[in-house]
Amino acid sequence: DHETRDEIMVPSRLEKRLVNIFLNRTQISDPYLCEKGMRNLRAARSLGSAACRGALNRLAVQDLGGSRSTLAGARERLRFIELKRLLTLAVEEALWVEEDALHYTEENYLRLFDRPFTGDGVDAFFAFLGIQGRASADGPSLVPKKILWLADESGEIMVDLVIIRLLARLGHKVVVAFKDGPV
């Protein structure tokens, strides 16, 4: 039942136009409105749970870089840890898709945070923000940036808002762009 089996593929722009025509003709504002609302509610409940808050705030001494860490180095490391954990939550779709996520324990969240954080743009992203995860020789490298944040999926937006608040607390100016229609 794969759409490419019959060699019929509809370009995404055409598909979007056809959906818009259907919605305009049927006077349905958004057929997925209830599902989007449930995703946002699930994500908000997961983020607000004691288990999630506890895991986000848990810190081991070795996380700060050892016993000879400086205050500047510790602050830099804390920024890195907090942002990394929030970004990890932003890609954990189960938080807003599955009901089981409401029953995650602190250990479940800590296992999520222990996953390797990789990708082509990870180092460049943290460097752009001035968050290196370690103390730099020249002191703090945090220079406020202007960031365009694209928010496009219900559920995920709840985590995005927490990340945006963190970036604003760090002095960055964040402009949020939403896709057309309710998120």
Predicted regions and their residues:
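Electropositive, gly/pro-rich neighborhoods at or near active sites that engage anionic ligands
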Residues: 1-146
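Short, glycine-rich nucleotide/cofactor-binding loops
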Residues: 147-159
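Redox- and metal-dependent alpha/beta enzyme cores, enriched for Fe-S-associated oxidoreductases
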Residues: 158-183
